[in-house]
Amino acid sequence: MIKVSNLSFSYNANDEALRNVSLEIPKGSWVSILGHNGSGKSTLSKCLVGLLSPTQGEIHIDDMLLNDLNLPKIRRMIGIVFQNPDNQFVGVTVKHDIAFGLENQCLPHDEMAKKIKHYAELVGMTEFLDKEPHQLSGGPKQRVAIAGALAMEQDILILDEATSMLDPEGTEEIIGLIKRLNKEYGKTIITITHDLSFAAQSDYLIVLKDGQIILEGTPKKVFAEEELLKSSHLELPFGLSLYNELKKDEQVDKNVLEALWAFNSEM
């Protein structure tokens, strides 16, 4: 469980990036935090992992207060993968990059090798272990960055705009991996995004605008507020907008509506 209470953050006196944000993220859920550029969503993600210290409010991870004293413990519980994985790579090869965090744990070499093999297999990167990360295309790069985070065996994983630089094929790869991590491995997943098609597949949505939560709920509940989303510069994909329009017509069969929703929320 992640609990955020009255969180505010300012980069300077005239720039309040977050204002009195309160939210709860249940263990084992997949939550998407939505917002246009400058909404505060990436600032929030950095606060959650302790990269930024809030000017006001508290964050609890599994009932543990995030502060300087608890930060080392918190970082063993929660990891983050940024939009551009090139900014995270530190290893000469994929194998060395996955191993980087493990080396800091002073694990025996054989145990480290097992973990590298396991997480490379999990993200489908076994055949690339001896490749340089920077030689890979977008989707494989993200999978390497995710493998490095998974190797730390944290229960919570934040993906900040993980698909924004990917083509449709790369996006589908990452979505499939997220679903597997969430459903099969019980990871709590937090995705930071402005892509509503992507967010439709998560369990719960939180919408930020100007550093404040303006809307939250299940995808169906949030996407029903189409005008409010538009005011936040978030456009529903055609299929989801069509669903909203057809829902207003009482003559449309409910089974048709449910099929349309299922199709668009699994794209």
Short names for language-model regions:
Residues 34-36:
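The feature captures the beta-strand-to-loop junction immediately N-terminal to the Walker
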Residues 132-136, 140:
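Conserved ABC ATPase signature
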Residues 49:
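Helix-to-loop junction immediately C-terminal to a conserved catalytic motif
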Residues 110-128:
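Conserved ABC ATPase "signature" region
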Residues 57-65, 74:
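Conserved ABC transporter NBD signature motif
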Residues 157-160:
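Catalytic Walker B motif of ABC-type/P-loop ATPase nucleotide-binding domains
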